[in-house]
């Protein structure tokens, strides 16, 4: 209740409060942005529904991740064009990523190659 209509100088992002489209109505007026993580939404399909619904109500989108390999991160790249922020650094936090993993260079994530999928 403390966030209702709070006038923040920076957008407040709902992370663990937002898992699926069902959560959005409760966030309106409290948050200006949501963090979409495919691990939370249950996969790419629900993440796409959530992103579209958030756009419809004027919420900004961040695409984030848990610590995971490039194989888990690659589908999230498909949401990148809808997001104001991307935080897909999960593979960088691992000692060893998958062979043929995503390439990170100069702040950019390169799209996956067919070899990533096995």
List each model region and its residues:
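Flexible C-terminal active-site loop/helix
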Residues: 66-118
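Catalytic alpha/beta core domains of metabolic enzymes, predominantly
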Residues: 2-3, 7-89
């Amino acid at each position: 209740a403390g966030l209702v209509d709070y006038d923040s100088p920076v957008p407040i992002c709902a992370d663990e409060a937002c898992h699926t489209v069902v959560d959005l109505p409760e966030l309106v007026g409290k948050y200006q942005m949501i963090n979409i993580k495919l691990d939370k939404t249950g996969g790419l399909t629900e993440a796409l529904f959530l992103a579209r619904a958030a756009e419809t109500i004027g919420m900004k989108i961040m695409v984030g991740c848990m610590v995971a390999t490039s194989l888990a991160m690659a589908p999230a790249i498909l949401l990148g064009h809808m997001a104001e922020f991307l935080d897909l650094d999960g593979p960088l936090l691992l000692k060893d990523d998958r062979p043929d993993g995503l390439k990170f260079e100069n702040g950019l994530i390169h799209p996956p190659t067919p070899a990533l999928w096995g």
